[in-house]
Amino acid sequence: MINNGKALNNKKSSDYSKLFRHQAKFVAGANHINQIPDFSLPEIVFVGKSNVGKSSIINTICNNKSLAKVSNIPGRTRQINFFNIIDKLIIVDLPGYGFANVPISVKEQWEVLITYYLRNSHNLMLVNLLIDSRRGIKENDKKVAELLLANKREFQIIFTKSDKVTDRKNLNYEAQNFLATLHYSCNVIYVSSRSKEGTKELKASLAKCIKYQR
């Protein structure tokens, strides 16, 4: 289902507004697989290419401009960061993949860390695959989606920086073809941290995960 920022009409709208009214706080960072914590709470993950806007989206939905560090320099997030919302939900910010200007050894370390987490987390409920609306779906994004499906991880596509794109027909078509190739169906949400488009829809999709806590 492709959502272009239209308001949701369901009983859960109040649930997400109550949840995200509370202040999220940074609780842990992991540079190595041995440092990954187990909070025994549902975890929602944000993953995407370097400089796709992960930190900005996290700050927007958590109503905290300084929660996750924002930078125009690709590769700013260099560890897995965990944010706790009133012991109900853990927001997870993964290092960006792709063109970060870091040594190859560091990129390889990130890849191991990201892959291990996505494969082994017992609390992972939903992955938000962030894609820059201006760039479209790239090969790295496809590989991540294939990894998620191989490990039976539920994900949805978040087109970031939606305020930068006016004609979405090609993006919608690209997303539909991409999902058809994977034989997978999921939400496709356009989100802008600047205009706040799609933030209600995104928050609602995250809040739903609490009721399915294992």
From Swiss-Prot:
Binding-site residues, Mg(2+): 55, 77
InterPro entries for this protein: G_ENGB_dom, GTP-bd, GTP-bd_ribosome_bio_YsxC, P-loop_NTPase
GO terms, molecular function: GTP binding; metal ion binding
Binding site for GTP: 48-55, 75-79, 93-96, 160-163, 191-193
Gene3D superfamilies membership: P-loop containing nucleotide triphosphate hydrolases
The protein's required cofactors: Mg(2+)
Swiss-Prot/TrEMBL keywords: Cell cycle, Cell division, GTP-binding, Magnesium, Metal-binding, Nucleotide-binding, Septation
Keyword Transport belongs to the record: no
Ranges for domain EngB-type G: 40-212
One Pfam family of this chain: MMR_HSR1
Xref: CDD domains: YihA_EngB
Keyword Cell division assigned: yes
One GO BP: division septum assembly
Family: Belongs to the TRAFAC class TrmE-Era-EngA-EngB-Septin-like GTPase superfamily. EngB GTPase family.
Function comment: Necessary for normal cell division and for the maintenance of normal septation.
Protein name: Probable GTP-binding protein EngB
Naturally occurring in which organism (per UniProt): Rickettsia typhi (strain ATCC VR-144 / Wilmington)
